[in-house]
Amino acid sequence: MFNTGQSCDAPTRMLIESNCYDEALEIAKNAAENISVGDPQTDGTHIGPLFDKIQFDRVQKMIQVGLEEGATLLT
């Protein structure tokens, strides 16, 4: 068995052709806004919480670096 059903999905970038940029951005934004975080064993939950404070801090740092480098936080 490769894993126990767990995976880390934290892409750091998306490469999008300019002719479909606005549409792709809207699709990504809507998908993120509709993710349900909670108890993974509860129906309707898409992902569980971050594993621990170390992971939480790592994600917060990645967001901060992105903003400092000119990214826009959509949701």
Per-segment meaning from a language model:
Residues M1-T75:
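ALDH superfamily catalytic-core signature
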